[in-house]
């Protein structure tokens, strides 16, 4: 879940950010394509640092199932965060911007048939 401050609306290509992070998460090897879900959520109510209205943020919450080792999480986190910061670099160079990321281990209940449909998409 990519949270971002509303003051980035005019300069942040949220759809491209979602695509960048989604593909980086899959490439990290930690998330199977059929299990990956990436979305961006604009935050309208926020305060960053001293409250200057130009201050902005992007915060990535990566929710993962239990059972990954610290090394796996570190490797994947480094890979995903590098992709996110590279994508945001043009904004980072122009304005006050806080970029952060966290992994949250979760227990989930889920059902999907995406693997079935993904197998049909293969050439």
Q: Positions of the model-derived regions?
A:
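Short, low-complexity, polybasic intrinsically disordered segments
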Residues: 109-123
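Mid-chain, well-packed structural core segment of small domains
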Residues: 50-90
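A short amphipathic beta-strand at an alpha->beta junction
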Residues: 36-37, 90-108
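Short edge beta-strands and adjacent turn/loop segments
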Residues: 12, 36-63
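N-terminal, polar/charged subdomain of small-to-medium soluble alpha/beta proteins
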Residues: 1-29, 33-36, 43-44, 66, ...
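Conserved strand-to-helix beginnings and helix N-cap segments that scaffold or border functional pockets
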Residues: 14-15, 73-74, 114
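Short aromatic/hydrophobic contact patches that present stacked aromatics
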Residues: 1, 59-61, 100
């Amino acid at each position: 879940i990519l949270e971002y401050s509303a003051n980035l609306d005019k300069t942040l290509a949220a759809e491209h950010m979602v695509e960048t992070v989604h593909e980086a998460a899959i490439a990290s090897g930690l998330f199977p394509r059929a299990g990956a879900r990436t979305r961006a959520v604009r935050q309208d109510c926020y305060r960053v640092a001293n409250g200057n209205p130009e201050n902005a943020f992007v915060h990535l919450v990566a929710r993962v199932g239990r059972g990954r080792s610290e090394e796996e999480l570190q490797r994947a986190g480094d890979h995903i965060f590098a992709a996110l910061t590279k994508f945001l670099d043009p904004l980072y160079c122009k304005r006050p911007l806080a970029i952060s990321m966290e992994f949250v281990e979760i227990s989930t209940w889920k059902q999907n048939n995406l693997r079935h449909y993904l197998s049909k998409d293969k050439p």
